[in-house]
Amino acid sequence: MKKFTKILSLSTLLFLAGCQSVLNEPTEVQQPGVQIPHNDAQWQQHLQQLAKIQSYSAKGQIGYISPEERFSSHFDWQYRTPTNFGLELSSNLSSKSLKLQRNARGLTISDSEGNSRSDRDMDSLMKEIIGVAFPIDQFAYWLKGQPEQDGNYIVNDKRQLSQFSYHINGEVWKASYVQYHEDRQPNLPKLIVLENGSQTLKIRVDQWAF
């Protein structure tokens, strides 16, 4: 297998042009006027509904913004179990793609050029390849708007996850939920903003299936 590092610096490979790019979505998130306590009955019912969604898929766009670069790509997230899930990033401008595949042996990151890296230490691999520690195991829950049971998070008056923070390897990720799909139960996120210092990930989910 070929060795490669910091794949996501290949922003031109995954860049999406056009006014519909997730990069144009709003980033500023206002604090909710009313914060619902974690033991609220409706919120607890919402959490139970989210917990029942154990196998699902989501498609949309993901954007990356830093002082050095900004790009966006399509994403296809397929989640089956905590040790069986995958994320594919692709562009409608080329046939190139980037895949992250989780199995019982750890995480494999590969691209359409034949480059591949695998490691049991997933956090270290994400740091090596992407340049930032990102808890990919937690992403399955973040995407659904399902916080850690004893985590530091805020619930809005619609009984939706509004914000939370997550510490990993001395770094802090702050998540803000800007919009939800409210035409189905349970309400699932439509636009999420993840921030880690000067780096921002904007995730827009266009399709949910479970």
Swiss-Prot record:
Taxonomic source organism: Actinobacillus pleuropneumoniae serotype 3 (strain JL03)
Superkingdom of the organism of origin: Bacteria
One GO CC term, this protein: cell outer membrane
PROSITE patterns noted in UniProt: PROKAR_LIPOPROTEIN
Signal peptide from the UniProt entry: 1-18
Pfam families, per database record: LolB
InterPro entries linked: LolA/LolB/LppX, OM_lipoprot_LolB
SUPFAM superfamilies membership: Prokaryotic lipoproteins and lipoprotein localization factors (SSF89392)
Cellular compartment(s): Cell outer membrane
Gene from which this protein is expressed: lolB
Lipid modification (S-diacylglycerol cysteine), residues: 19
GO biological process: lipoprotein localization to outer membrane; protein transport
Gene3D superfamilies registered for this protein in UniProt: Lipoprotein localisation LolA/LolB/LppX
HAMAP family: LolB (MF_00233)
UniProt subunit comment: Monomer.
Main location class: membrane
Primary role: Plays a critical role in the incorporation of lipoproteins in the outer membrane after they are released by the LolA protein.
Protein's name in the database: Outer-membrane lipoprotein LolB
Family: Belongs to the LolB family.
This protein's UniProt keywords: Cell outer membrane, Chaperone, Lipoprotein, Membrane, Palmitate, Protein transport, Signal, Transport
Lipid attachment in record (N-palmitoyl cysteine): 19
Recorded topology in the membrane: Lipid-anchor
